[in-house]
């Protein structure tokens, strides 16, 4: 009986003390216990009586509890364990005040903010505010370092991940969840089950999505996902789905890009589509230009900007009547129609981060001008800086309502038709080409962007992207249908140059 008595006495000794030094709010308190029960967990309670049920994980023969206090004050906890030596033991630790903003949450439909400060969050990965990393034990120290640095770790769960251990190790930290690196290789129902398991156990209610080969939009209807991810170098999928989904989105636009100029241009195109960037800069120069982007966007009301289509065919963002941002990828004359106010006008150089201010303000409803030179791309910034400052003084996160667009599906009103595939069947092995033929010719239709998706509805796996652009080669995933032949539903969505979204669909027989 003596060893049992010593164990209990030792446990009481530890729990009677401050198990962590005073810990700033939103920083980690890790409690290490000389226990061996892998089911050990603790219920933590803060000063405002919100509780967190935290499971332990095993390392070096001991049990570890990780808690991040969300407010200053005294936190108490009570252990539950199958080991009588630890069951019902209690302890406390102190949290001190800090300026940490909290964790990321959804706000204003397509944007993010911090949970504690309620200030906007500018998603900038992988060289800014976010770092993507596999949620593995081997990466434990790196994930802890990301948290300590005040950044967010976008955790990618391997398909064989031990989810309960991942929750215990990382669930208290500043993270987001991606339940798969590429969900398309997995069964949709299995992905949903993994996601629901995470959401049920995640005490901090972190954002959750999935990695993808193209778009995680097919998972949106399942209800668990709260932000969208893309892997879209040309940006057509996120630009079009931005008009459909009431969710924020991030795009890994830089896949395969090694050239600095191409990376910078793709970064700004992604931004103009209303999507946040989530790509690693391929060079040191590209990383510096990403920092230029962060500096510029941080000075805008980025949390209210939406794609704007009255910029003479240029890609643009706007909070109309307050701020307009136009990306001039190919230097030349630009015309922008704005609400009539007194605006400051400036040109931002995305290469070196310098700003050139126009001498005269814009007081009319139309800006017409040329960038300072034609050597490279430029960003035109038209804004009411004094008005923006006033908006910040009387802080209101959301100053306008964002409504989803209704797709025009009436064939008589759609300005294009599906010309390819012809016939009634598509071969999985050799799917052939796709093409949309314009039936109405205008500046708006000439600038149209297309997204082609396919779905075998009977199999319940939702849609997959099979092409982008007006024409090209269909790429049909081999696991799109569980058995062949199958009824294939092909859909094309087209976004014209003034922001109107159209859709057509057609059924085919999918054969081997």
Give, region by region, the residue ranges found by the protein language model.
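Short, solvent-exposed loop/turn segments at the edges of extracellular beta-sandwich modules
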Residues: 82-84, 494-500
């Amino acid at each position: 009986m003596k060893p049992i008595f010593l164990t209990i006495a030792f446990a009481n000794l530890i729990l009677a003390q401050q198990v962590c030094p005073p810990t700033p709010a939103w920083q980690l308190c890790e409690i290490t216990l000389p226990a061996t029960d892998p089911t050990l967990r603790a219920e933590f309670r803060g000063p405002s009586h919100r509780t967190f049920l935290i499971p332990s994980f095993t390392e070096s023969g001991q049990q570890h509890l990780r808690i991040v206090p969300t407010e200053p004050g005294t936190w108490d906890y009570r252990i539950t364990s199958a080991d009588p030596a630890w069951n019902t033991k209690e302890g406390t630790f102190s949290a001190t005040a800090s300026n940490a903003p909290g964790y990321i949450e959804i706000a204003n439909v397509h944007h993010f903010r911090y949970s504690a400060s309620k200030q906007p969050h500018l998603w900038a990965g992988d060289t800014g505010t976010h770092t993507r990393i596999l949620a593995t034990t081997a990466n434990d120290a790196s994930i802890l370092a990301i948290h300590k640095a005040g950044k967010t770790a976008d955790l990618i769960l391997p398909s064989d991940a031990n989810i309960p251990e991942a929750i215990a190790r990382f669930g208290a930290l500043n993270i987001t969840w991606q339940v798969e690196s590429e969900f398309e290789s997995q069964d949709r129902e299995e992905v949903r089950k993994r996601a629901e398991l995470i959401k049920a156990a995640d005490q901090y209610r972190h954002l959750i999505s999935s990695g993808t080969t193209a778009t995680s939009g097919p998972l949106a209807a399942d209800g668990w996902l709260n932000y969208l991810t893309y892997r879209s170098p040309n940006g057509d999928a996120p630009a079009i789905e931005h008009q459909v989904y009431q969710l924020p989105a991030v795009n890994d636009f830089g896949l395969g890009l090694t050239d600095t100029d191409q990376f910078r241009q793709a970064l700004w195109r992604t931004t103009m589509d209303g999507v946040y960037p989530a790509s690693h800069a391929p060079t040191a120069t590209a990383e510096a230009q990403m920092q230029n982007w962060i500096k510029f966007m941080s000075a805008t009301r980025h949390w209210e900007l939406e794609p704007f289509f009255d910029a003479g065919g240029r890609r643009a963002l706007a909070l109309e009547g307050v701020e307009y941002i136009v990306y001039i990828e190919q230097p030349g004359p630009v015309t922008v129609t704005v609400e009539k106010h007194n605006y400051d006008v400036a040109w931002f150089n995305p290469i070196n981060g310098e700003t050139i201010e126009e001498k005269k303000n814009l007081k009319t409803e139309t800006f017409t001008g040329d960038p300072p030179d034609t050597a490279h791309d430029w960003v035109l910034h038209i804004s009411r800086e004094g008005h923006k400052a006033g908006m910040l003084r009387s802080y209101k996160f959301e100053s306008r309502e964002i409504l989803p667009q209704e797709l025009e599906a009436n064939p008589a009103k759609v300005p294009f038709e599906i010309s390819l595939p012809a016939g009634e069947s598509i071969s999985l092995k050799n799917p052939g080409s796709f093409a949309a033929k314009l039936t109405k010719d205008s500046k708006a239709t000439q600038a149209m962007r297309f997204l082609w998706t396919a779905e075998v509805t009977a199999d319940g796996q939702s849609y997959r992207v099979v092409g982008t652009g007006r024409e090209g080669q269909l790429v049909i995933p081999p696991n799109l249908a569980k058995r062949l032949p199958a009824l294939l539903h092909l859909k094309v969505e087209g976004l014209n140059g003034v922001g109107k979204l159209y859709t057509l669909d057609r059924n085919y027989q999918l054969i081997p």
